[in-house]
Amino acid sequence: MKTPASSRLLVAGYYGFGNLGDEMILASLLAIARRLWPGCSVHALSGDPEQTAALHGVTATSWTDLPGTVRAVAAADLVLLGGGGLFHDYWGVSPGDLLSPRQSGISYYAGVVALARLLDKRVGLWSLGVGPLLTPEGRELTAAVFREAEYAAVRDAASL
């Protein structure tokens, strides 16, 4: 995915929630982004923006701050979701909850992608885990997200 060196990246994943695996995923995503696009600036959506900023050297907005999320997406050149198991519907899926803190799964992350596309932003999906998808709504919403992405990579064969 070609992008200018001055790019502004927005990353969204399960960051800032105290899960070491997700923090390592963000650290590796940042290392790759900074190597590919030296000089890029990175902003993250996070459960704990202060912690995410301190740990990773990025700016961050709370994932529950809808106006802040809109500003972050609007300011980005590229919106990256991932990695990790963001697309599952263990607790159901509600398309009416797009971008809502009531849903931290498919509905929330699909909302980030929908907002990005409404604002004509590029979308990439990086090292995502997909599934289980137990509901037709979960499968349809996940497929819609993947159709909107310019680039998509999953973390394992089970996610294909």
Predicted regions and their residues:
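Alpha-helix capping/helix-boundary segments
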Residues: 86, 158-159
